[in-house]
Amino acid sequence: MTMYERLMTLPIFKGVGTEQLSLFLEKTHLDFDNYEAGAVIQPLLEDCNGLKCVLTGRTEMVYTLSGGESRLVAEYGPGKVLGMERLFGMDTRPRHEVRALEPCGTMSFSKEQYMSLLRSNHICLINYLNYLNYHCQRIEVSMESLYSRSVAGTLAVIVSLMTDRDCRRIVLEGMDRLWATGPENAQADYDRQVDGLVDAGYVKFGNEGEIIIESRQSLLDYAESLQEQNR
């Protein structure tokens, strides 16, 4: 895959012609970096002052849940653009860390250069607005169509809100501790429901009680069907 072909797969350049992309590359100062497996690509709570595009390699995004009681780790392939949701607004510090799962290559450019691109290219502006719109709307969509008083519904809401559609694999750690703080029978009910999800193939167990979700969409579809049944 050529560099142009790789860049055309990035969501910020979706639908942009080769000539327009060439013009942007000619006018923009770009930083290219390489990361070894395990290296931090995006630190937690560091001010976002530009975009970083993952051109090669797999990454994982690590989120803390419930005040650190639990964690969600989401795996993504090449083509992820980091910083889009934190580039503007009152809080520009990402609430998750991004690490390299294998050697990764990135391309970065500043917020000012991206703003110049948005002013000069309406396709890129629409791409960015669509991205922000998706992130805003999925909150009410998730709560309306997925949430139910079940483990499947709770997991689906977390996954829907915290991960994107191109997520390859999700690992949830410490979810059992959330139910352990509930009523006396909550832990047993949690174990029973998770076992049912494992038997049905929606999740599987990892190390030390990890819940592994190989297909994000399958879990969301199942949770939505449960919500439909309860209406």
Q: Across the structure, where does each feature detected by a protein language model lie?
A:
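Short phosphate-coordinating micro-motif centered on Lys-Gly-acidic
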Residues: V40-E46
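Cyclic-nucleotide recognition modules
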Residues: L72-N130
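Phosphate-/nucleic-acid-contacting segments
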Residues: S160-R231
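Polybasic "coupling" helices that flank or enter modular domains
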Residues: H122-N185
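Cyclic nucleotide-binding regulatory module and flanking cytosolic helices
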Residues: M1-F32, E36-A37, V81, R86-G89
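A cytosolic small-molecule/anion-sensing beta-strand core signal
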Residues: E36, L55-T56, G77, E102, ...
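A short beta-strand-loop-beta hairpin characteristic of the jelly-roll/cupin
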Residues: T59-R71
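Glycine- and acidic-residue-biased ligand/ion/polar-headgroup-sensing regions
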Residues: N49-V62, P78-G79
